[in-house]
Amino acid sequence: MSSLSVFHVSSPDTPNKVLTHLEDIASTLGEHGVAFDRWEAAAPITPGASQEEVISAYRTQIDKLMTEHGYVTVDVISLNSDHPQKAELRAKFLEEHRHGEDEVRFFVAGRGLFTLHIDDYVYAVMCEKNDLISVPAGTRHWFDMGENPHFVAIRLFNNPEGWVANFTGEDIAGRFPRLED
């Protein structure tokens, strides 16, 4: 189940609130310019599927997002527990960073913990199949796929180069809950 846990930066062990209803999650994130919605991920995709398979299966949804929001680049991150670089990728994504452009993720299989650091609060969003999250440019965040990843996410960007992270050098991500496998 998708959820949102909101923490004050001074209390990483205890969330101020935990939300599980789509409307509550979307409203809370929307106050900070973050869009959260549910789309139907109808095509059967399994973690480990190739980028070409995923893009082909979801071409209609991808084209709609690219047209409506001006995204110019699409890629797919598709990982399962057998991926040879899972530890390196997890470590990279767990470092707090930001992008110079919006980042959109549409989860078409599995789950991941997308965590946002906004002012004095941390918003941990458990994203699952059918979840669409759009994070505005400049928002500090990190992503945890767990020790044994099992997810497929379509990522869209305004930048033709795709995923370009500007790491903050902060160690805040290590103080907050991780995705439990």
From Swiss-Prot:
Its cofactor is Fe(2+); Ni(2+). GO terms for biological process: L-methionine salvage from methylthioadenosine; L-methionine salvage from S-adenosylmethionine. The record marks 102 as: May play a role in transmitting local conformational changes. Keywords: Amino-acid biosynthesis, Dioxygenase, Iron, Metal-binding, Methionine biosynthesis, Nickel, Oxidoreductase. Its EC number is 1.13.11.54, 1.13.11.53. The record marks 96 as: May play a role in metal incorporation in vivo. GO terms for molecular function: acireductone dioxygenase (Ni2+-requiring) activity; acireductone dioxygenase [iron(II)-requiring] activity; iron ion binding; nickel cation binding. SUPFAM superfamilies: RmlC-like cupins. The record marks 105 as: Important to generate the dianion. The keyword Protein biosynthesis does not apply. Fe(2+) binds at residues 97, 99, 103, 141. Pathway: Amino-acid biosynthesis; L-methionine biosynthesis via salvage pathway; L-methionine from S-methyl-5-thio-alpha-D-ribose 1-phosphate: step 5/6. Disulfide bonds: none annotated. The keyword DNA-binding does not apply. It is an enzyme of class 1 (oxidoreductase). Ni(2+) binds at residues 97, 99, 103, 141. Binds 1 Fe(2+) cation per monomer. It catalyses: 1,2-dihydroxy-5-(methylsulfanyl)pent-1-en-3-one + O2 = 3-(methylsulfanyl)propanoate + CO + formate + 2 H(+); 1,2-dihydroxy-5-(methylsulfanyl)pent-1-en-3-one + O2 = 4-methylsulfanyl-2-oxobutanoate + formate + 2 H(+). Belongs to the acireductone dioxygenase (ARD) family. Catalyzes 2 different reactions between oxygen and the acireductone 1,2-dihydroxy-3-keto-5-methylthiopentene (DHK-MTPene) depending upon the metal bound in the active site. Fe-containing acireductone dioxygenase (Fe-ARD) produces formate and 2-keto-4-methylthiobutyrate (KMTB), the alpha-ketoacid precursor of methionine in the methionine recycle pathway. Ni-containing acireductone dioxygenase (Ni-ARD) produces methylthiopropionate, carbon monoxide and formate, and does not lie on the methionine recycle pathway. Monomer. PANTHER family: ACIREDUCTONE DIOXYGENASE (PTHR23418:SF0). This is Acireductone dioxygenase. The gene is mtnD.
